[in-house]
Amino acid sequence: MNDTFFNRMLATNAGAGALALRVPVGIIFAAHGAQKLFGWFGGYGLEGTGQFFGSVGLHPGYLMALLAGAVEFFGGLALVFGLLVRPAAAALAFAMLIAIFAVHFSQGFFLDKGGYEYALALFAASVSLLFSGGGRHSADVALAARSGGGR
C-alpha cells in the first residue's frame, strides 16, 4: 500500500467534536449490525433480515443481510475505537444510501411511518466523519504516527 495514501487516510486535525460524534454513532451502527448478524437486541438475525431484504428487492437477501450487518457491526466498532474511521465511514454512508432508497424512501420522510429521516441523519454523520476523520482522540492518530505520518 502506498504510505502517502495510508497517511492521508489516517490524517485528522479534528478535535473532540469528532469523538463526540463517532462514539455514539458507532454504538448505534454496531447495535443495528448486531441485530442483523446475531439477532441481538431484539433483532431478527441473518435469516429474518435476509428474508426482509429479499422482500424489498435486495437479492440475494441473505448475502445482503450479511453485508449490511457486517458493515454496520464492524464499521460501528471501528468508529467507536477510532480505527480506520474514513473507510468505515465511507462504507457506512454507502449502506445508509441503500437503506434510504431501497427501504425507507417510499415511506416518506418521517420515522413514525418508516421514513428515511433516521437513515438520513446516520448518513450525514457518516459523511461528516468521512471528511473530518476520527479526530485527535482516535487510534488513527497513533497509526499515522507509527507509520511516519502526522496529523
Tell where the protein language model's regions lie, with residue ranges.
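Membrane-interface interhelical connector segments
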Residues: 39-60
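Extended, low-polarity transmembrane helix blocks
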Residues: 1-40, 62-70, 74, 81-151
